[in-house]
Amino acid sequence: MSEPLKPRIDFAEPLKEEPTSAFKAQQTFSEAESRTFAPAAIDERPEDEGVAEAAVDAALRPKRSLWRKMVMGGLALFGASVVGQGVQWTMNAWQTQDWVALGGCAAGALIIGAGVGSVVTEWRRLWRLRQRAHERDEARELLHSHSVGKGRAFCEKLAQQAGIDQSHPALQRWYAAIHETQNDREIVGLYAHLVQPVLDAQARREISRFAAESTLMIAVSPLALVDMAFIAWRNLRLINRIATLYGIELGYYSRLRLFRLVLLNIAFAGASELVREVGMDWMSQDLAARLSTRAAQGIGAGLLTARLGIKAMELCRPLPWIDNDKPRLGDFRRQLIGQLKETLQKSKSSPEK
């Protein structure tokens, strides 16, 4: 009975919010604490990389302008007119028994058919390259999904596109590891850890081989024009090899588009990553003082080829990078330097013998 009475609560009125101070309380540090104080390092690289990726997507997104629609409509109308006129000429030649004109119409029909077939084939290959980006987005969604039923069919489709046989040991291990109680995220994750590294290892070997050839060619060759032509040819072959490994058949326009994608990715995100991964280690080892100018140029060309191959891998892979499995330039740099030093030592020792 000695407890004080509680104040009345009127439920008809809105609840009163407790006033909150707009200012934080002052914090004071002693002199000893100020000596050991270390500011928190804020990593702004993910935000910068996100801005770069958004810029790449904006640059690569096709722009449907009115002029393009008018040109496409005009070409379609012209093609229909050519086909109609060809049919009319064929009918007239058949009725008048003009066999020479009829043979010309048949030859023209064969040429037009071959051209249409080439256009359809190029469009199909270009569509397949664009579809790989959609598959990568789908894989990213499955890796963050808890649904069931889509992961296995998706991974089997990827294995079929890459040309992996059903009896392959990696694919057999994946089949043995999955079961019905697993969701899509776990199934796709197992595929990324058991099957996808087989293709990635082959792509890494191709990148290492092409980068080493570029490094040695630049370091040995005295002709700059030959170097430029050789590097351009080898880089195009590297892109073709990586695309073939990941099950993408390139045509003329799809090859140009993939090369454009790679160059744009390097332009937006390559410089900062190159400096971050190579610059400090390069200066610490003082390689510029140890190697000649041509050797340094060869290492630079090899690193550029490796960078090109890494970006081609990223654009041709059906799965996004997970668990830091993306290859780094440092992985290829040590190999390039070792091969170049070995070659230079052999070239110096051979005249002495």
UniProtKB/Swiss-Prot annotation:
Region feature Disordered, mapped onto this chain: 1-35
Keyword Ion transport: no
UniProt biased composition (Basic and acidic residues): 1-19
Keywords in alphabetical order: Cell inner membrane, Cell membrane, Membrane, Transmembrane, Transmembrane helix
InterPro entries linked to this entry: DUF697, UPF0283
CC annotations in GO: plasma membrane
Transmembrane annotation, as ranges: 70-90, 100-120, 213-233
Coarse class of the protein's main subcellular location: membrane
Cellular compartments annotated: Cell inner membrane
UniProt-listed Pfam families: DUF697 (PF05128)
Domain of life: Bacteria
Mode of membrane association: Multi-pass membrane protein
Family, similarity comment: Belongs to the UPF0283 family.
Designated name of the protein: UPF0283 membrane protein YcjF
Organism: Salmonella paratyphi C (strain RKS4594)
Gene name of this polypeptide: ycjF
